[in-house]
Amino acid sequence: MAATFPGVCAVVPAAGFGRRMQTECPKQYLSIGNKTILEHAVAALLADARVQRVVIAVSPGDRRFSQLPLAQHPQITVVDGGAERADSVLAGLQALPEAQWVLVHDAARPCLHQDDLSRLLSLCETSRVGGILAAPVRDTMKRAEPGKTAIAHTVDRNDLWHALTPQFFPRELLVDCLTRALNEGATITDEASALEYCGFHPQLVAGRADNIKVTRPEDLALAEFYLTRSRHQEKA
């Protein structure tokens, strides 16, 4: 399968700091077990043989990445990221001219499951636009009054999904959409939103809800629990 699969590479934007973690260390460099969150995230991508190369966009002047064993991996390339996520992703894409399809994965999302990644990668066989891992909303959703904490109304959760990563698109399409969206001042919160802005409709690929992003201090313990459970299941 790997011999006929189109060229797939990945970009991991890792130039952010994550101030909500309330630590002096950028969250992607916090440790879970004997690896950083970033190392867990990248290892999940490289575990699939179809992913040929991973470009990691770090903050200019970052001194932490070069100290990781990951920095010497033959399939890893590091580039300087930008002020915003979209700038970092574009910098990564420019370093991957050979890629036909590109995964974009959060540096702080260490719990990606291989079966989810495999289903997402299969999109390149059926889609011209690509798609994202996502999880259906299960909780009751409330919208607050503007600028307040008072409830304005309950939001119908039918057809609502939590956007996850990786997100997976044809490289040229993603470059074009990100460039246009940035040039026109659009608000881009993830790569799919750039495609949406340009009139495309990526697919939602159901993924596991435990593919969490470490954003707040309490997320670190939860991610450690999920990773430990996953290792135990693999050994069983």
UniProtKB/Swiss-Prot annotation:
Q: Give the E.C. number(s).
A: 2.7.7.60
InterPro entries per record: IspD, IspD/TarI, IspD/TarI_cytidylyltransf_bact, ISPD_synthase_CS, Nucleotide-diphossugar_trans
Q: Where is this site: Positions MEP for the nucleophilic attack?
A: R157, K213
Which reactions does this protein catalyse? 2-C-methyl-D-erythritol 4-phosphate + CTP + H(+) = 4-CDP-2-C-methyl-D-erythritol + diphosphate
**What's an example Gene Ontology biological process for this entry?**
isopentenyl diphosphate biosynthetic process, methylerythritol 4-phosphate pathway
Enzyme class per UniProt: transferase
Q: In which pathway does it act?
A: Isoprenoid biosynthesis; isopentenyl diphosphate biosynthesis via DXP pathway; isopentenyl diphosphate from 1-deoxy-D-xylulose 5-phosphate: step 2/6
Site positions (Transition state stabilizer) are R20, K27
Q: Which UniProt keywords apply?
A: Isoprene biosynthesis, Nucleotidyltransferase, Transferase
Name the domain of life this protein comes from.
Bacteria
To which protein family does this belong? Answer: Belongs to the IspD/TarI cytidylyltransferase family. IspD subfamily.
Its biological purpose is as follows: Catalyzes the formation of 4-diphosphocytidyl-2-C-methyl-D-erythritol from CTP and 2-C-methyl-D-erythritol 4-phosphate (MEP).
Q: Quaternary structure?
A: Homodimer.
PANTHER family recorded? 2-C-METHYL-D-ERYTHRITOL 4-PHOSPHATE CYTIDYLYLTRANSFERASE, CHLOROPLASTIC
* Protein name per the record: 2-C-methyl-D-erythritol 4-phosphate cytidylyltransferase
- Gene label: ispD
